Amino acid sequence: MEQELIVRDLTPQDDIRTVARLIYETDEYIYPYMFSSRPEEAECVLGQMIAADTVYHWSHIKTAVVGGRIAGIVVWHKYPVKASRRAMLEAYARADAVADERFERVYNDYFGLLEGEPEGVYIANVCVDKAFRGRGIAKALLGGFLRDGETYHLEAVQQNAAAVRLYEALGFRVTGEYEGFGGVPCYRMTRPSRDEKLSACSGISQ
């Protein structure tokens, strides 16, 4: 029997370690560099960040739950985004880890730049556990999260064609290209609110 998929907010009582692992697995460039390809350390630090006032705070994470297990996550923020460098450094300390020059580079080249983004909602991370992939969970998770009255922004690696197709199927459109962290070609994508779409069409004669 197919297990029911539930889309809901993350709570502090959930399996935070799994959520931290999924955040780490979201991006094969930023997080392996930031944590020197040490996933166990990353899970500890990111777990502390989820509990603190950082860009990963649990109140900004939507989950897909299948059979009681967290199968996927969306990390999001309402603009303006607060990167919270101090809180991130404190999370490193609580995890008995050292925030070295790699953290500083990622903060300056990625996290810090988020504070200058436009209005709307920024989707920072989308990830489905490898054990649950191929079941349409990412589409269901995003479909349960997105609302017509909001404008959403995200970035996608250009070579990740499957992700780009998914976002386009959900109403996102490419609005720009840029060189992402480590020189990786990326797209900026936006899903305008329903109100914006109606406004754009209001002057068209029927």
Model-derived features: positions:
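Conserved GNAT-fold acetyl-CoA-binding loop/helix
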Residues: 28-49, 93-97
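A short beta-loop-alpha structural element at the N-terminal edge
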Residues: 6-21, 30-33, 79
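Conserved N-terminal entry element of GNAT/NAT acetyltransferase domains
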Residues: 1-14, 195-206
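C-terminal "cap" of GNAT-fold acetyltransferases
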Residues: 153-164, 170, 176-206
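Active-site rim helix/loop that mediates acceptor-substrate recognition in acyltransferases
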Residues: 39-61, 65-66
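Conserved acetyl-CoA-binding loop-helix of GNAT-fold acetyltransferases
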Residues: 134-147, 165-169
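Conserved GNAT acetyl-CoA-binding A-motif
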Residues: 119-121, 148-159
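Conserved acyl-donor/pantetheine-binding loop and adjacent beta-alpha core of acyl/acetyltransferases
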Residues: 80-121
